[in-house]
Curated annotation (Swiss-Prot):
The protein's role, per its UniProt record: Enhancer-binding elongation factor that specifically binds enhancers in embryonic stem cells (ES cells), marks them, and is required for their future activation during stem cell specification. Elongation factor component of the super elongation complex (SEC), a complex required to increase the catalytic rate of RNA polymerase II transcription by suppressing transient pausing by the polymerase at multiple sites along the DNA. Component of the little elongation complex (LEC), a complex required to regulate small nuclear RNA (snRNA) gene transcription by RNA polymerase II and III.
Compositionally biased spans, kind Low complexity: 269-279
GO CC aspect terms: cell junction; chromosome; cytosol; nuclear speck; nucleolus; nucleus; transcription elongation factor complex
Modified residues (Phosphoserine): S242
Domain called OCEL: residue spans: 283-393
Gene3D superfamilies linked to this entry: 6.10.140.340
Name this polypeptide is given: RNA polymerase II elongation factor ELL3
Organism: Mus musculus (Mouse)
Superkingdom per UniProt: Eukaryota
Biased amino acid composition, Acidic residues: 243-260
Lineage: Eukaryota, Metazoa, Chordata, Craniata, Vertebrata
Keywords, ordered alphabetically: Nucleus, Phosphoprotein, Transcription, Transcription regulation
InterPro entries for the chain: ELL/occludin, ELL_N, Occludin_ELL
Gene that produces this protein: Ell3
Region annotated Disordered, chain positions: 129-177, 189-281
Single Gene Ontology BP annotation: regulation of epithelial to mesenchymal transition
Amino acid sequence: MEGTQEALSGKMRLLFTPAARTSLLMLRLNEAALRALQECQQQQVRPVIAFQGHRGYLRFPGPGWSCLFSFIVSQCGQEGTNGGLDLVYQRLGRSGPNCLHCLGSLRERLTIWAAMDTIPAPLLAQEHLTEGTRESESWQDTGDEPEGHPQLAPDEVSDPLASHHEQSLPGSSSEPMAQWEMRNHTYLPSREPDQSLLSPASQKRLDKKRSAPITTEEPEEKRLRALPLASSPLQGLANQDSQEGEDWGQDEDEEGDEDGDSRLEQSLSAPSASESPSPEEVPDYLLQYRAIHSTEQQQAYEQDFETDYAEYRILHARVGAASQRFTELGAEIKRLQRGTPEHKVLEDKIVQEYKKFRKRYPSYREEKHRCEYLHQKLSHIKGLILEFEEKNRGS
């Protein structure tokens, strides 16, 4: 992206029939996303992409870091009624004029920016965390830890998009990408109204929910639009607040209990399922926040969003940092065979750490549930605001 670019020159050759199963997109991304892509290319690891209609996420994996970016797919702007954009690449000829190949028309644009919901690895983002977050992390570094059991370094940040069947991807980085995301997490470029790339029938349904065009935004509006409409990232963390987790500290003397051993491994290694309310338990925010019909109502919703979002960020950092440790231990014990001395040593270590964790962070469960509740509430409010803006677009 840096440096001067030479002007394209040469003979033009038109190739308006792209290869089968090939889509041509205009890519817009900030410096952090570009560097992450370049790093993945150098380390030969594959990014993970997930679509949610005309929105989605890109995750760049690696040991010790994991960077999450959001993206939207929108329609490319056209110059005039008959204007358009074509994808052209230049082939430098050793002899004779250069050749310009037109691969086809660009109808969609992929805009990438850093996602707010990325949970940075605690050791990499320690300088960026608040004092309250550091206190929540300190449980794993203090106390009566038995000697001979070194601390496990974090391997990878929990993936908020992966299902419980997916495995972490390998990779490495010379510069922690989590720090790039922390520096760029408020970046959100201007963009055209969103468009769907699904079937025509699906596109008609999604056209009604496109985001309004954004020219200039206040900081709070940037933060509002940076919160993805997705499931809570905390739902992918280890389910250490389950009933099985409550039994770890009580059953530590039952060394021969295979059921308890299996229960322990399952609780640590398997991410918790999505917690959706039952039909009779309708969340209060669904009753309180309904469709927006006026600008004053929109402003009131945005004020409520900002108030809850400040609390959400604090809880998210505290809970994410504390849960990361058990996510790592869960992945570690899953790789060991049950009944082996190594498995037993790690199991005892987990029991001891969990007992210390409960003493140093007694409010973890309440804060975790509160954080997940706020995430769903903020996503709901954001959706209503964007829907109202879309209805008033162009009026």
